[in-house]
Amino acid sequence: MKAHQIFQHASPALTRGIFHYLRTEQKEVYRTTVSTLAAGRKLRPVFVQKKTPEEQYAWLQKTVSMKGSDTVCEHLLQIWLLKAQRDLLVKFLDGVGIAHDGEGAADDLPDTIDADKLKATVQSLLAEYDPELVAVYLNTFQLQRLEGWDAIRDLIAADPRLQLGAPAPAKAEAGEAAAE
């Protein structure tokens, strides 16, 4: 899944949360994003900046869902995850045994990820975090290598809770998927 597709399939509440976080906590990133995306649409940034925050978020959602915005989308997701979702990143990296700086950034990514460690780690994350957040993280993490990791791709394919844009499973189904 490409970065713009993550935004296409994520819930409006999650994407609004991402944009709101960036607007309030990462102001320079937000301004640069608006300027870059506006220029890509042949608009002056002031066109977007004059809108209310909610109107800006709606414009951003529409714009980042377009195919040509992948680079910006991936950058936004990385910043949001590293800054706003640090605990999730650290738990994932620790769980699968990837060395990191203690804040969720890893310099050397492995060629393979142990499927059993991955499954146990993701089940733990799903018990603690919103499944959509875990799905966004896994799909974004997959973008860190050209072909991603087979173990992550297979796990996403096997568990509907990790599939962005898929209907949420009923509670009984979610319990069955966790038991597998």
Where are these regions (language model features)?
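Short, aromatic- and cysteine-enriched interfacial helices/patches
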Residues: 3-6, 64, 96-98, 162-164
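Terminal short linear interaction segments
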Residues: 150-168
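Charged, amphipathic alpha-helical stretches
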Residues: 2-30
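Long, low-complexity, intrinsically disordered segments
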Residues: 170-180
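Acidic, low-complexity, intrinsically disordered interaction modules
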Residues: 24-153
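A generic alpha-helix propensity feature with a strong bias for hydrophobic helices
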Residues: 113, 163, 170-172
